[in-house]
């Protein structure tokens, strides 16, 4: 807004704030100043005007109003106080007031008359001001009640040349009466009420229709914070080092609050506090109608005054008002303790608008200060006649609801946490079968092992096993027991150790006089780590369903097509199983693919024989639970010869009474039973892995037979069966290749199985396969 605006009042304006043209009328700035002192001045001319040029860097002048009458000493420049107050409430420090009908003296000042009547009016106004703003002296506050009125001239030098030029231009447009209004005697210093007001060099006649008080609420880059507008009963928060929850101000700056809510700063303060007002709803609201800008002087507002202020210093690094941070500058914290500035700088203060509560509103929340210099704790701030409420914020480290982490001594008294079962996460009852488990999982594992149950998962072998759902899927529960390392041999070993300890306890009691005799401790402890066989049990694929419709009449084509589709899904399951075998993925990727292409028929035929042996006593072929080839189906064309080879495997397993551990080791060895003639890319690693599982087969035999002379004989029989699988698989592959190449049979093959057969046909026709046999023919 331009500084040359008319001061001509409208008809609707309040007469108390209008400058009339008649001599002797009164100017009332009370409503405009909003809480400032009412200054009544008798005007000797028909119009009153004041203009001055002041830079943004001005010197603050301190004015002392004694409690008594006005003394005869040289009076300070009250016009600067009026100018500063007007700038404070209008949003800028350089307030421009001007009108076309205002008369300005030629000297650039308005002298105050020494008339007795005018002096009485001024004394009466000052007395009213002292009565309204006087408060009892704080015994711990050394600062006197004063008002910071004008900035320092060192920081804000005046430009008198601009002032004189402006006054010459204004002289021609103002009234003819150039007399000065005298309120003081000649021996008292005169001062200009509007001395600090700045006028631009433009014509004062511009924009005469606008109000001079509608100035742009913008701040010069060197100015202070924008003013805070207040209501008619506005008050400023009082900060004192002896009170709790006070606003944070600069060190050695101790603001006071009079009874009527006016702010009085100490004479040593160079800082103007932003105004905090209260609304009729009894809560504090900060109003900033202007633009908040960073100040170059890094002045900190609302910082607590305490002896240990040097911990923080006069400079702050960020600005945050009402929880809003600007991009660098000062930090302004309202109603928060100083510990949060140094310790919780990454957290913004939270201000909650809390209505008055009858029960909990006796005083403000106690803020616990911290610091190395015995920082004064923030105290209680009470205003007479006003409801006291909680500030709604405290540092996170000071909040009572935030509990500190328990110390080691407190945790020791509460006791150790309960031990959980490694299978279902229920409360463990002890170490069962070498693993910390509950009683339910202990009984389940014992029954599952001794009963030799062949559990099947209805899902994908990834069921959740916990306290509530542990009975839903016994297959996944049993798998999790094996993964945890449960083993029946651990219990037997534990009993042996316990028996040895009991036997040696009596001997040690008898020979307790001899310190050389000690309790015998076994040299070997039970193996609690899972073995390869237990891992093979865990990764064993589930039984797949063929989806065969038994209500439809059987045919060779339909059965063969269904078996091919089932075989394609079994090959996918075999690939996943092979990748889970310990050591197999260490081989080269090409070697892994080659071994799977050579052994896929071995794996499916041997698994078919195992299912037929366990479920049908080797009399039927159990391809799937919903597809069992009985003697009637074997009589179909092209079915009997192939079924005869498959029944051979089942019958041999039944004859030898192969255990589940032996079956798992033999199946793994069938995966490693055929290689190319040129060898594998990681042949040495392959030989090492194969030898490892041969030893595992020997361990499974020893586990079944014990330390007997028949172990080598059984090992011979089982390895002989493995060698015979090559002949069985060769016959099955020949028939499979024939049906794949003969399009007249119209037997469908899944995509993956067709790809494997296509890659395998040239290798078999060229004889590029080397059989790894245990025995020479």
From Swiss-Prot:
First and last residues of each zinc finger (NR C4-type): 421-441, 457-481
One protein family per Pfam: Hormone_recep
Low complexity composition bias: residue spans: 134-150, 394-414
PTM comment: Acetylation by CLOCK reduces its binding to glucocorticoid response elements and its transcriptional activity. Increased proteasome-mediated degradation in response to glucocorticoids.
Record keywords, A-Z: Acetylation, Chromatin regulator, Chromosome, Cytoplasm, Cytoskeleton, DNA-binding, Isopeptide bond, Lipid-binding, Metal-binding, Methylation, Mitochondrion, Nucleus, Phosphoprotein, Receptor, Steroid-binding, Transcription, Transcription regulation, Ubl conjugation, Zinc, Zinc-finger
InterPro entries (UniProt xref): Glcrtcd_rcpt (IPR001409), NHR-like_dom_sf (IPR035500), Nucl_hrmn_rcpt_lig-bd (IPR000536), Nuclear_hormone_rcpt_NR3 (IPR050200), Nuclear_hrmn_rcpt (IPR001723), Znf_hrmn_rcpt (IPR001628), Znf_NHR/GATA (IPR013088)
GO BP: any one term: cellular response to glucocorticoid stimulus
Cross-link (Glycyl lysine isopeptide (Lys-Gly) (interchain with G-Cter in ubiquitin)): 419
Annotated region (Interaction with CLOCK), positions in chain: 485-777
Renumbered residue ranges of the record's region Interaction with CRY1: 532-697
GO cellular component, one term: cytoplasm
Domain of life, source organism: Eukaryota
PROSITE patterns cross-referenced by the UniProt entry: NR_LBD (PS51843), NUCLEAR_REC_DBD_1 (PS00031), NUCLEAR_REC_DBD_2 (PS51030)
Subcellular locations according to the entry: Cytoplasm; Nucleus; Mitochondrion; Cytoplasm, Cytoskeleton, Spindle
Subcellular location, principal: cytoplasm
NR LBD domain segment(s): 524-758
Region (Disordered): 1-23, 130-182, 394-415
Polar residues: bias regions: 164-174
Residue ranges the UniProt entry marks as DNA-binding: 421-486
Cross-link type Glycyl lysine isopeptide (Lys-Gly) (interchain with G-Cter in SUMO2), residue numbers: 258, 277, 293
Residue numbers bearing the Phosphothreonine modification: 8
GO molecular function, one term: nuclear glucocorticoid receptor activity
UniProt name for this protein: Glucocorticoid receptor
UniProt organism field: Aotus nancymaae
